[in-house]
Amino acid sequence: MMLEIPDVLTSAQLRQCREALEKAAWQDGRQTAGHMAAQAKNNQQLAQDDPLSVELGEFLLDRLGKTDRFIAAALPLKVLPPRFNRYSGGGNYGNHVDAAIFSVPGTPHRIRSDISATLFFSEPDEYEGGELIVEDTYGSHAIKLPAGHMVLYPGTSLHRVAPVTKGVRLASFFWVQSLVREDSQRAMLWELDGAIQRVTLDTPESPALPQLMALYHNLLRRWSNT
């Protein structure tokens, strides 16, 4: 399931993040990639232990916890601290699949990358190219969202970032281990949750509502791992 999450950040929050990122100490992104991925990667990235990366990452985690659409779609169990990248001057990232398991910095813990996420800090008209291109069974999807918007897509997806031929593309990216590992099951729960919300608004006294809610929670109980 691929899903856009609009307005994760307010205009004021977005402006503060951008001002900080524009002054950041960017490093060669290949330093954080594995051997194979490094051959396809041509961008800049904040070091994970950079104080700004830590500060902004904690801020974004707080925002995600208050974003209902993200919670309902991702059903997050663990979220890897967000990372930050910068593309300019032809920077790109060739086709790759993200690692299945990531270590949580500064801890002995690891997470499984069920869901990949990208949050855009740059407006689409501020740079040329730079589309996030995700491939699935239905073809290729080019994603270039307004600043403050985020996209979620399965961690199993082959994807790439097209060359940024003009301007600068700033973004955050991270991974989620979901309560529900299987993407198709998460998609069904998302659709069912949406149906419950519509029935709640349209006919709150409907006798079908408690049945739908029971079905949702029983499926979540069956499919989830905690």
UniProtKB/Swiss-Prot annotation:
Cofactor binding mode and count: Binds 1 Fe(2+) ion per subunit.
SUPFAM superfamilies tied to this protein: Clavaminate synthase-like
Coiled coil: none
GO BP: DNA damage response; intracellular iron ion homeostasis
Entries under Gene3D superfamilies matching the protein: q2cbj1_9rhob like domain, Rabenosyn, Rab binding domain
Domain Fe2OG dioxygenase: from-to ranges: 78-178
Superkingdom of the source species: Bacteria
Sequence positions that bind 2-oxoglutarate: 169
Pfam families: 2OG-FeII_Oxy_3, PKHD_C
Cofactor(s) in the UniProt record: Fe(2+); L-ascorbate
InterPro entries, sorted: Oxoglu/Fe-dep_dioxygenase_dom, PKHD_C, PKHD_hydroxylase, Pro_4_hyd_alph, Pro_4_hyd_alph_FE2OG_OXY
EC number(s) given by UniProt: 1.14.11.-
Entry binding sites for Fe cation: 96, 98, 159
The entry's keywords: Dioxygenase, Iron, Metal-binding, Oxidoreductase, Vitamin C
GO molecular function: 2-oxoglutarate-dependent dioxygenase activity; iron ion binding; L-ascorbic acid binding
HAMAP family the record matches: Hydroxyl_YbiX (MF_00657)
Identification of the protein by name: PKHD-type hydroxylase Plav_0377
Species assigned in the record: Parvibaculum lavamentivorans (strain DS-1 / DSM 13023 / NCIMB 13966)
